[in-house]
């Protein structure tokens, strides 16, 4: 089961205040519903691939309107996909849709009602329903943090974006070939949204996975950095030894000034130690890392001049 499915499963188990639940129902119907005219009566079909969401819609219709709804199951034939669940309403359809401010007579309302837009708790419930209807969120294990809600109608999509930004979630809109999306980026904003709609357990799981993943990435970056530094140290030491051996084989180390000869002999004897450790081995007294670095640079310059002369 995907992370998005886990979130929706948690949401279907929430107990919500009666009036706030109507806002959730309005979102589910508006975003997943379709109307048809049968025998001069409007028939509403609300479709979902999630059985728990279908049961929740069915229960909300029964609880709020004592509606004689039907719960149907259809098997998708293409590509052997999941079942499709349909909540069908044949009676009092216009009355219920009018009460939810989805229709005014026979006219469809594209915007979310002012009653919902002006009430913080109802907005939260509407966003919960909107996410259950057509929301998705990436698994926190992935490298991209992304959550989106799809809408067919632009005005409705803009209202969802307004609601999200009422809670400072930095939501943005984007047109798609067959509709519009309102989306969130960033782990903190997504975690805030999950908390907002009541998916507390999913939020905690999201944060746990994100923290472990971010920590793992930090450790990997640290290891890579340490490895890069170690490789640089090894390369530098190899170059130093190569230059010292060249001096030794051409003019001998005794041709170096006494202080440089001292360093050269120690480097040949201890090729694996760091400059700091090398400085602590000087018989005449410890020298700082910068002091050792200065003498090594002089040895390298001496070797380069020898190469130029022998070329």
UniProtKB/Swiss-Prot annotation:
Keywords: Cell cycle, Cell division, DNA-binding. It comes from the Bacteria. One of its GO terms (molecular function) is DNA binding. Residues 274-308 bind DNA. GO terms for biological process: cell division; regulation of sporulation. Belongs to the WhiA family. NCBIfam families: DNA_bind_WhiA. Involved in cell division and chromosome segregation. This is Probable cell division protein WhiA. It comes from Enterococcus faecalis (strain ATCC 700802 / V583).
């Amino acid at each position: 089961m995907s992370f998005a499915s886990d979130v929706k499963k948690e949401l279907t188990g929430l107990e919500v205040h009666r009036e706030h639940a109507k806002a959730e129902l309005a979102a589910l119907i508006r975003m997943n519903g379709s109307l048809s005219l049968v025998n001069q009566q409007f028939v509403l079909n609300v479709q979902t691939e999630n059985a728990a969401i279908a049961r929740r819609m069915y229960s909300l219709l029964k609880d709020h309107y004592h509606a004689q709804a039907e719960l149907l199951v259809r098997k998708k034939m293409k590509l052997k996909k999941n079942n499709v669940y349909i909540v069908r309403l044949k009676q009092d359809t216009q009355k219920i849709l009018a009460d939810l401010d989805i229709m005014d007579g026979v006219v469809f309302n594209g915007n979310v009602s002012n009653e919902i837009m002006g009430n913080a708790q109802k907005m939260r419930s509407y966003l919960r329903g909107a996410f259950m209807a057509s929301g998705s969120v990436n698994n926190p294990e992935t490298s991209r943090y992304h959550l989106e809600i799809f809408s067919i109608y632009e005005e409705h999509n803009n209202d969802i974006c307004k609601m999200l930004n009422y809670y400072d979630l930095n939501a943005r809109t984007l047109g798609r070939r067959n509709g519009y999306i309102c989306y969130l980026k960033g782990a903190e904003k997504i975690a805030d949204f999950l908390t907002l709609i009541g998916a507390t357990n999913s939020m905690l799981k999201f944060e746990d996975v994100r923290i472990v993943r971010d920590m793992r990435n930090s450790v990997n970056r640290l290891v890579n950095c340490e490895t890069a530094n170690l490789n640089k140290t090894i390369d530098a030491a190899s170059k130093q030894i190569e230059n010292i051996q060249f001096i030794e084989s051409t003019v001998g180390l005794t041709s170096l000034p006494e202080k440089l000869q001292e360093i050269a002999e120690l480097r040949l004897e201890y090729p694996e130690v760091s400059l700091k450790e090398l400085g602590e081995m000087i018989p005449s007294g410890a020298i700082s890392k910068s002091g050792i670095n200065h003498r090594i640079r002089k040895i390298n310059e001496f070797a380069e001049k020898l190469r130029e002369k022998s070329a």
